[in-house]
Amino acid sequence: MHDANIRVAIAGAGGRMGRQLIQAALALEGVQLGAALEREGSSLLGSDAGELAGAGKTGVTVQSSLDAVKDDFDVFIDFTRPEGTLNHLAFCRQHGKGMVIGTTGFDEAGKQAIRDAAADIAIVFAANFSVGVNVMLKLLEKAAKVMGDYTDIEIIEAHHRHKVDAPSGTALAMGEAIAHALDKDLKDCAVYSREGHTGERVPGTIGFATVRAGDIVGEHTAMFADIGERLEITHKASSRMTFANGAVRSALWLSGKESGLFDMRDVLDLNSL
């Protein structure tokens, strides 16, 4: 992997997130936009990636074939769908390319494929690339260790109407951070839905509630509720650029790393706190 001018390829270049990833790649010093990809048959194929993102002409045209651009990038940034990301993962593993994965909604087999690939290539895989969200995850660990055994814990998340997975990857990461701090497995204590006569709340569980409406970029709250008081830790995103900037920053951070599985907390060095 090159030590300077890390060349990135953007998957789903014509989507909302893809366009902002292009903008972020063009703006960050030390990063070069090397390739932009769209699905076969897209009307955007052949377009200039910079013009597509409203950033001016770059000379990088949108293509559908990874083979055609395999010599043009060092790190592949993917915020698409699980099935597409896994295809891209296999290609990157075969050709020794780093990856930044922001796709959510993987099943356990998909997550295992990412872990397996990290034996051969360097991957940053995170549910959320926002600096604020990752600071929040660290705060949740601290709060859970102090309050978790004595409070009812609920996670509430809201996103735009087009989001296809629920709960969000970030909400699940919040649950995992809390469960880990309490020496629990989230699979054993998560409650994802309540309907009808549910009975009283089961102590020690972590509840999840999901909202899908309008154009909400992303809102997440963790509630630690006791009798007479509750602590709420909330993050609200108002622009996808916060995720795009974090993803491109992660690609730059991968410079010089040959293999391994990392997350945004590694990029921000939060694990040392």
Curated annotation (Swiss-Prot):
It comes from Escherichia coli O139:H28 (strain E24377A / ETEC). The lineage of its organism: Bacteria, Pseudomonadati, Pseudomonadota, Gammaproteobacteria, Enterobacterales. (S)-2,3,4,5-tetrahydrodipicolinate binds at residues 160, 169-170. InterPro entries: DapB_C, DapB_N, DapB_N_CS, DHDPR_bac, NAD(P)-bd_dom_sf. This is 4-hydroxy-tetrahydrodipicolinate reductase. It is found in: Cytoplasm. Pfam families: DapB_C, DapB_N. Keywords: Amino-acid biosynthesis, Cytoplasm, Diaminopimelate biosynthesis, Lysine biosynthesis, NAD, NADP, Oxidoreductase. SUPFAM superfamilies: Glyceraldehyde-3-phosphate dehydrogenase-like, C-terminal domain, NAD(P)-binding Rossmann-fold domains. Homotetramer. Pathway: Amino-acid biosynthesis; L-lysine biosynthesis via DAP pathway; (S)-tetrahydrodipicolinate from L-aspartate: step 4/4.
